[in-house]
Swiss-Prot record:
Described purpose of this protein according to its UniProt entry: Member of the two-component regulatory system CitT/CitS. Regulates the expression of the citM-yflN operon. Phosphorylated CitT binds to the citM promoter to activate the transcription of the citM-yflN operon.
SMART domains for this protein: REC
Superkingdom of origin: Bacteria
High-level lineage: Bacteria, Bacillati, Bacillota, Bacilli, Bacillales
Species name: Bacillus subtilis (strain 168)
InterPro entries: 2C-system_Tx_regulators, CheY-like_superfamily, DpiA-like_HTH, Sig_transdc_resp-reg_cit/mal, Sig_transdc_resp-reg_receiver
Molecular-function GO terms, alphabetical: DNA binding; DNA-binding transcription factor activity; phosphorelay response regulator activity
DNA-binding region, residues: 178-197
Record PTM: Phosphorylated by CitS.
A Pfam cross-reference name: HTH_64
Keywords: Activator, Cytoplasm, DNA-binding, Phosphoprotein, Transcription, Transcription regulation, Two-component regulatory system
Domain Response regulatory: 3-119
Location of 4-aspartylphosphate modifications: 54
Cellular component GO terms, alphabetical: cytoplasm
Protein name: Transcriptional regulatory protein CitT
Length: 226
């Protein structure tokens, strides 16, 4: 379970974040703070794994608060969600080692995607006693090999995302639904289905209907045999 603290002075935005987080498995909100002072008090009172931090708060800039958080709560990861677009804020955040930087307004899909990616990376780090270069490249998003030149792909299909879909299917011999694919790659079910259906159309994957006990049958996707 990933414990999240929300530091946001706009209560409406904080409520939106809270609602979206509650829709995701594996996350729990430990509390909300409306300013820097409340943020430090919240982190002192409750153990947090991840802090969603706004920059423009009433009593202090979020970026100015980060060194204090790093010193007092080194185990807390920080993700900035802000309307601040000045480059200097991003530079300060990067130097402080933040997990991500999101600019408001953030779409629900993007918000969920970033949290699921964080969850995946955290799980990967906690499950491996040692790291490899490929694992490091995956964590930092480097060393990506594109499966096809961008000009060969239709509109709405990105080569990097397509590669992630193929890798997910490659490691799932039992097949994956669009929802399961979306969770693995940190995207919506609609996006995952679009990419999976594209692979089916290129005969690089196949789809089969799986009938459950109740409800409508689901399409499961399998990587096509070489």
């Amino acid at each position: 379970m990933i414990h999240i603290a929300i530091a946001e002075d706009d209560f409406r935005v904080a409520q939106i974040h809270e609602r979206l987080i509650k829709q995701l498995d594996g996350f729990k909100i430990i509390g909300k703070a409306a300013n820097a002072k409340e943020t430090l008090a919240l982190l002192k009172e409750h153990k947090a794994d991840l802090l969603l931090l706004d920059i423009y708060m009433p009593d202090e800039l979020g970026t100015a608060l980060i060194p204090d958080i790093r010193s007092r709560f080194p185990e807390v990861d920080i993700m900035i969600i802000t309307a601040a677009t000045e480059t200097r804020h991003l530079q300060e955040a990067l130097r402080a080692g933040i997990a991500h930087y999101l600019i408001k307004p953030v779409t629900a899909d993007k918000f969920r995607q970033v949290l699921l990616q964080y969850k995946e990376k955290r799980k990967l780090l906690m499950s491996q006693p040692e790291v490899s270069q490929s694992m490091i490249d995956h964590i930092f998003g480097n060393g990506v090999k594109t499966a096809l030149p961008a000009e060969d792909l239709p509109t709405g299909i990105n080569s990097i995302t397509l590669r992630k879909i193929k890798e997910a299917l490659q490691t799932a011999s039992e097949g994956l639904t669009a929802e399961e694919l979306g969770e693995k790659m940190g995207a919506s079910r609609t996006t995952a289905r679009r990419y999976a259906e594209y692979l089916v159309s290129k005969e690089e994957a196949r789809a089969e209907l799986e009938y459950g006990i109740i409800g409508r049958p689901e399409r499961k996707y399998y990587l096509a045999a070489d």
